[in-house]
């Protein structure tokens, strides 16, 4: 296999046994593809596909005026260029967006002409607001903060059949219902009531009999009955009644008389129940007429109206129950034939017939009026209004849309073969749904499972943005329609008709404040990726936490390979917010698909198909771990498979598909947990969630025991610098990498230079530090896709969230009681868990009523010492160490005139005005914060003079840009001259540049000429002259291009900033705060094993082994058995082996062993103990040595989920590292030197420091603010609040009889306003007495009682 630049330097020993059939797909594809589809940015007018913006425009346009004399048509749109790039947007606090310009055509028709001749056509581009762009990492920058739009899992449009599970009626009878859900428009529900009549509801309003809807659709009673029922035909001749017999219909009935065949042989005796055997005999005998007694038709329902043959008068309407009186009438009228409905109690109930009987309407108009009354109660119905309303409900494309998905689901559910069709409903659709519902009630067919992933689809960013955009356009449409009527008379242009504000507002609201537009979780690369791959059932059009029951939240069999069964939050959102599985993707309809290998006749192929939950149901799917031979044949007699959403076993020849990988079941976060298969699910859930909270440490440290997914996450998350094209590193420093692109990847006419500016010490959304460090050196060769620089929490292109710690599982002095963690001081000294946090502090100078605020170093009543870190502009220097209360930006605010005392007047007269009319409102460092200023940004409003600091910052930025562009030009120039040198070498000169004709060019000749002189050469060959001219022109063009680029950037920097109204200047100061680990910080492993640091012990006191190596962390062994996360023990053992092998390699290097010996030992590690084979043959000796050097701190291992290291392999690794195979060692107490009784499990575990730091939580109140009503101190750190002394605490003091303490707690320390001020005065006077008064809460109580209308007063004697 081919190794990438970083893989070659450090190979991870992989224990997986199964072959890689398919690489893990790009992890952010779900976001990027969806939004790319929405914008269709590169497409030309003819290439637009009917999705996204284009579809939204097409659905609203053309807009036709009310009179029909003018129309506005949509032609196409184009997107402009963004004003700022992503980094500038974040810095300036603006949205990263592009202007949208739409080309529309205004057509005015001639009123006079009969055939609507066109009078005038105007075409124009109209600005329609800004559309936010997605960054290449799948995020949006909205108002300077990075946000993620989470995908939504909602009910797919279509038709669903369900029942109430017997909960509605006390008898427990199942009431069936059908619901047609469109993509937009009114919901249509059909439901049975306990009496078995069918009702319809529109938009969940009052119910009507379903027949009302059928009547409104134009069906008569007879047509309805014909549609839903078959008929029995009876012939009457005199007193005799005979039935046209269909034998099947008799099944289950009791014979009312003997039934004979033609020969008179009795087939069924009277009183016997007719069975299937009897039916067969009747069919064989060919009995098709049956004489029946008159009573046989009593109680049956007529299928057609019964008409008097002579007079034509109607004796009985259709759908009338036959009674004895009616039969007498029929006999009198000498009717020869009656048709009745065929119903029975088993599989053909009289539901529709019964519904028609309770229906009060008799024709279409009455039905329409009834529906109108239900939809618009209180309004007087007219025929036109009722018809319009009904047509608009389900049959108008403007108001109703099933969407392609809805139509496909609808047609499939009611058994049609075609999957495309109209977006609106038809009569047939409604009737088919009713038929299917009645069939289900009759016991044919089954109800749908609403939690099946075939009935839930994913709405991604693009689709949600399109919906919002359409909402905005519909608002515009109303306004345009009104203005169109004026367009003709006033000669308006399209621009005057369209007001883009509603569109811009709808889009802005969606990206800024929708429930699914979330502040990106940017703790570490994994939390970013997980946030973008999240699927939420909440949000607009989705579920709410309170209403979601167990079923929706539960794991469903169809989640397999689509949604992770492990990763979901704990708490109220459990199961509502999920994560996509590693290989899952969405199909064109938005359903989740999972990949499978095709299996034919027991032979597994490498063809891969993606199937949705609906498509996979009929397949027989084997697991990825099913045993195969070399010919890829399944060899087990019975293979474990999934079929019809159940787990079972089948013969190999029945298998049709096979999983592509064992990790296709779980999400990215869960696939990073080694030995996941040995952990309990609840703990795995915690492990997945806690990895997302890990804070990037100062020096990232790759996990010794990983799963092989670390590289994918680091690469796809976008925090690393990945080579866009292959080439050679031209130069590299801490802040940028310059690559000279390989010739075969350079497109003609462009510079073969890629410059990568690295992000240095930038603040993330969670205030952690984003910093990139180069991995490459000058002259290194890189290929496309190689990782050239590490970001936060990445180490050599692998995700590295924590540190490998030497741990021991042992109880030790109670320091690890209840999951506490005991650490060694060495961890702190080596800065293993030191993290850098960056805080942004902002100072805003506004224009106030009394005058402008001013940012200055001249602050009243502040000593010189407090100002020594500020420059002359009043802004702190970069690099200054500041602590709580230090001034960062000096600011003064004008203050209103106050009445002055005579003394103040005198002082003013002597010392001048200045000091008194302004107050100090400087930006100071908040309490509990201490750090270093690493950056300052100054933004000034247009027209306000910029201070010296702003100019200095601007000059620095310009120098940076100029340096970049010069570098690019230098390389372009160098590469051009290199190409020329190779072309000219050995060629003959025709003259020019001071050379004689006939001179042969050599390297010396060229070195003797200045570069400018080369272009003056005239060569004997014309082709070379042409090449020289082209090269000269190319260099001139490049120079001009780069100069233009510089001017453009300069213009952007020098123009004033667009600040909020009333703001003159904003200064942002960035503080870097360094936090070491300390007691109270939360730490965790990857297996849900979390704890709080309880104590940090000196190194010499920690337990140590026989060699004197102390352990770093002591964990409580009781934390393992009850939690059932045994994965941590296996990780510890394997980690010990990994470290031991590293130390062995280190010794070999120190003893200066030969490369061949090292190669032999590495082969033993990588290729002799299970797992994937590594091809060490292709490595040179230098590369083997470089590899060995990188393995000194431990050989990293990968144990993929469900396909990891076996116990025997861990033991073999320990043996190879010359360590005990039990993984246990004898330890000695560092304090006494005594040996512990039993051997202790010691090894290396990967530990994370979570973003729950004690520094952020510790807080103490001194003097602070009080609540307005109760006058009690506020609560919480943000409000600088106090600790609540609640009722239980009061009981405790009462119980101890601590009366004075209790009194001051309830009065002066809380809400006795006078008492507390008096106490302060007393303390100042040196008088330590306390006089409690009336607590304010008593006054509040009295006011509340009075509000109930009870007069209450406190009498003070």
Curated annotation (Swiss-Prot):
Catalyzed reaction equations: RNA(n) + a ribonucleoside 5'-triphosphate = RNA(n+1) + diphosphate
Keywords: DNA-directed RNA polymerase, Nucleotidyltransferase, Transcription, Transferase
Listed Gene3D superfamilies: 2.40.50.100, 2.40.50.150, 3.90.1100.10, DNA-directed RNA polymerase, beta subunit, external 1 domain, DNA-directed RNA polymerase, subunit 2, domain 6, RNA polymerase alpha subunit dimerisation domain, RNA polymerase Rpb2, domain 2
Gene Ontology cellular-component terms listed: DNA-directed RNA polymerase complex
Keyword Ligase: no
GO molecular function: DNA binding; DNA-directed RNA polymerase activity; ribonucleoside binding
Enzyme's top EC category: transferase
EC number: 2.7.7.6
Name of one Pfam family that matches: RNA_pol_Rpb2_45
One example of a Gene Ontology biological process annotation: DNA-templated transcription
Similarity section: Belongs to the RNA polymerase beta chain family.
Function per UniProt: DNA-dependent RNA polymerase catalyzes the transcription of DNA into RNA using the four ribonucleoside triphosphates as substrates.
Protein name according to UniProt: DNA-directed RNA polymerase subunit beta
Species of provenance: Pseudomonas putida (strain W619)
Lineage, opening ranks: Bacteria, Pseudomonadati, Pseudomonadota, Gammaproteobacteria, Pseudomonadales
């Amino acid at each position: 296999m081919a190794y990438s630049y970083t893989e070659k330097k450090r190979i991870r020993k992989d224990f997986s046994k199964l072959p890689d059939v398919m690489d893990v797909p790009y992890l952010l594809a779900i976001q990027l593809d969806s939004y790319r589809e929405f914008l269709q940015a590169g497409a030309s007018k003819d290439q637009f596909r009917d999705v996204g913006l284009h579809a939204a425009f097409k659905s609203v346009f053309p807009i036709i005026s009310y009179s029909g004399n003018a129309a506005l048509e949509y032609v196409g749109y184009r997107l402009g260029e963004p004003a700022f790039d992503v980094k500038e947007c974040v810095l300036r606090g603006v949205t990263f967006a592009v202007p949208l310009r739409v080309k529309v055509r205004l057509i005015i028709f001639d009123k006079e002409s009969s055939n609507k001749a066109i009078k005038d056509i105007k075409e124009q581009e109209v600005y329609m607001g800004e559309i936010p762009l997605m960054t290449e990492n799948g995020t949006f920058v909205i108002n300077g903060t990075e946000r993620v739009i989470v995908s939504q899992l909602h009910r797919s449009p279509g038709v669903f059949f369900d029942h109430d599970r017997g909960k509605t009626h006390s008898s427990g009878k199942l009431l069936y219902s059908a619901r047609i859900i469109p993509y937009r428009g009114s919901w249509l529900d059909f439901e049975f009531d306990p009496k078995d009549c069918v009702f319809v509801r529109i938009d969940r309003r009052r119910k009507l009999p379903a027949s009302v809807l059928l009547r409104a659709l134009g069906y008569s009673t007879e047509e309805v009955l014909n549609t839903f029922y078959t008929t029995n035909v009876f012939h009457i001749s005199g007193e005799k009644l005979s039935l046209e017999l269909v034998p099947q219909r008799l099944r289950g009935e009791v014979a009312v008389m003997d039934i004979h065949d033609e020969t008179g042989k009795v087939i069924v005796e009277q009183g016997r129940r007719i069975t299937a055997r009897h039916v067969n005999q009747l069919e064989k005998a060919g009995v098709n007429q049956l004489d029946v007694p008159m009573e046989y038709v009593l109680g049956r329902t007529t299928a057609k109206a019964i008409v008097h043959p002579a007079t034509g008068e109607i004796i009985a309407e259709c759908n009338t129950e036959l009674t004895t009186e009616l039969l007498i009438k029929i006999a009198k009228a000498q009717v020869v034939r009656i048709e009745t409905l065929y119903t029975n109690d088993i599989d053909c109930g009289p539901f529709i017939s019964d519904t028609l009987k309770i229906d009060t309407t008799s024709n279409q108009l009455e039905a329409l009026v009834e529906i109108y009354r239900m939809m618009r109660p209180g309004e007087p119905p007219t025929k036109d209004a009722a018809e319009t309303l009904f047509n608009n409900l389900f049959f108008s494309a403007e108001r109703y849309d099933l969407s392609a998905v809805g139509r496909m689901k609808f047609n499939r559910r009611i058994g049609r073969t075609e999957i495309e069709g109209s977006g609106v409903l038809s009569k047939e659709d409604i009737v088919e749904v009713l038929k299917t519902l009645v069939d289900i009630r009759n016991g044919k067919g089954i109800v749908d499972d609403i939690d099946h992933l075939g009935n839930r689809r994913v709405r991604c960013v693009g689709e949600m943005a399109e919906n919002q955009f359409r909402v905005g356009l519909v608002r515009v449409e109303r306004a345009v329609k009104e203005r169109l009527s004026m367009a003709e008379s006033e000669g308006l242009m399209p621009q005057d008709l369209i007001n883009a504000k509603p569109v811009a507002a709808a889009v802005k609201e969606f990206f800024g404040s929708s429930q699914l537009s979330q502040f990106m979780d940017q703790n570490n690369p994994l939390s970013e990726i997980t946030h973008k791959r999240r699927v939420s059932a909440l949000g607009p059009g989705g579920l709410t936490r309170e209403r979601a029951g167990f079923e929706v939240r539960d794991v469903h069999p169809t989640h397999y390979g689509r949604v992770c069964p492990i990763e979901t939050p704990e708490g109220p959102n459990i199961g509502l917010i999920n994560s996509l599985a590693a290989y899952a993707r969405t199909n064109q309809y938005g359903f989740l698909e999972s990949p499978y290998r095709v299996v034919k006749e027991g032979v597994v192929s490498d063809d891969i198909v993606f199937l949705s939950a609906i498509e996979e149901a009929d397949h027989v799917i084997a697991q990825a771990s099913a045993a195969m031979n070399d010919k890829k044949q399944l060899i087990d007699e019975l293979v474990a498979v999934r079929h019809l959403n159940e787990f079972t076993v089948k013969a190999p020849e029945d298998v049709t598909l096979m999983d592509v990988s064992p990790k296709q079941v779980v999400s990215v976060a869960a696939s990073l947990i080694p030995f996941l298969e040995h952990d309990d699910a609840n703990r795995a859930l915690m492990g997945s969630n806690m990895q997302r909270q890990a804070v990037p440490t100062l020096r990232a440290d790759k996990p010794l025991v990983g799963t092989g997914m670390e590289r994918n996450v680091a690469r796809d998350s976008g925090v690393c610098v990945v080579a866009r094209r292959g080439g050679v590193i031209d130069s590299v420093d801490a802040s940028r990498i310059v690559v000279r692109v390989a010739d075969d990847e350079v497109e003609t006419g462009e510079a073969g230079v890629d410059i990568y500016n690295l992000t240095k010490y930038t603040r993330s959304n969670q205030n952690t530090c984003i910093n990139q460090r180069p991995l490459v050196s000058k002259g290194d060769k890189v290929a496309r896709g190689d990782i050239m620089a590490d970001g936060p929490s990445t180490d050599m292109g692998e995700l590295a969230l924590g540190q490998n710690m030497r741990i021991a599982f042992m109880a030790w002095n109670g320091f690890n009681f209840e999951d506490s963690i005991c650490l060694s001081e060495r961890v702190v000294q080596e800065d293993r868990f030191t993290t850098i946090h960056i805080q942004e502090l902002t100072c805003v100078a506004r224009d106030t009523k009394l005058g402008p605020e001013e940012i200055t170093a001249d602050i009243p009543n502040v000593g010189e010492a407090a100002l020594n870190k500020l420059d002359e502009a009043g802004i702190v220097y970069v690099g200054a160490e500041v602590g709580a209360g230090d001034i960062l930006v000096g600011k003064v605010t004008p203050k209103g005139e106050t009445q002055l005392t005579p003394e103040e007047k005198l002082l003013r007269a002597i010392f001048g005005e200045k000091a008194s009319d302004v107050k100090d409102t400087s930006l100071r460092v908040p309490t509990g914060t201490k750090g270093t200023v690493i950056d300052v940004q100054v933004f000034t409003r247009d027209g306000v003079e910029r201070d010296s600091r702003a100019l200095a910052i601007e000059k620095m930025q310009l120098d940076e840009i100029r340096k970049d562009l010069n570098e690019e030009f230098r390389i372009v120039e160098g590469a051009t001259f290199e190409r020329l040198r190779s072309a000219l070498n050995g060629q003959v000169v025709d003259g020019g540049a001071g050379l004689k004709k006939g001179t042969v060019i050599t390297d010396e000749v060229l070195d003797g000429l200045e570069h400018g002189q080369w272009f003056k050469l005239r060569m004997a060959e014309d082709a070379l002259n042409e090449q020289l001219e082209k090269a000269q022109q190319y260099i001139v063009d490049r120079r001009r291009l780069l100069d233009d680029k510089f001017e453009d950037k300069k213009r952007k920097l020098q123009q004033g900033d667009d600040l909020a109204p009333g703001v003159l200047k904003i200064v942002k100061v960035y503080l870097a705060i360094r936090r070491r680990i300390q007691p109270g910080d939360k730490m965790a492993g990857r297996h849900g094993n979390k704890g709080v640091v309880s104590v940090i012990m000196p190194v010499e006191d920690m337990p140590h082994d026989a060699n004197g190596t102390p352990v770093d962390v002591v964990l409580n062994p009781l934390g393992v058995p009850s939690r059932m996360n045994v994965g941590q023990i296996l990780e510890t053992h394997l980690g010990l082996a990994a470290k031991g092998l590293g130390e062995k390699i280190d010794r070999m290097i120190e003893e200066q062993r030969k490369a061949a010996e090292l190669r032999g030992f590495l082969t033993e590690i990588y290729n002799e103990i299970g797992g994937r084979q590594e091809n060490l043959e292709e490595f040179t000796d230098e590369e083997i040595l470089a590899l060995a050097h990188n393995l000194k701190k431990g050989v990293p291992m990968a144990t993929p989920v469900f396909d990891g290291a076996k116990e025997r392999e861990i033991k073999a690794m320990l043996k190879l590292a010359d360590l005990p195979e039990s993984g246990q060692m004898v330890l000695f107490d560092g304090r006494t030197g005594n040996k512990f009784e039993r051997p202790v499990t010691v090894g290396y575990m990967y530990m994370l420091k979570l973003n729950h730091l004690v520094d952020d939580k510790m807080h103490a109140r001194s003097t602070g603010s009080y609540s307005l009503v109760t006058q009690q101190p506020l609560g919480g750190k943000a409000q600088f609040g106090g600790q609540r002394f609640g009722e239980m605490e009061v009981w405790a003091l009462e119980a101890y009889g601590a009366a004075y303490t209790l009194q001051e707690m309830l009065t002066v320390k809380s809400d006795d306003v006078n008492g507390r001020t008096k106490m302060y005065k007393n303390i100042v006077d040196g008088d330590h007495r306390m006089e409690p008064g009336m607590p304010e809460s008593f006054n509040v109580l009295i006011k509340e009682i009075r509000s109930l209308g009870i007069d209450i007063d406190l009498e003070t004697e």
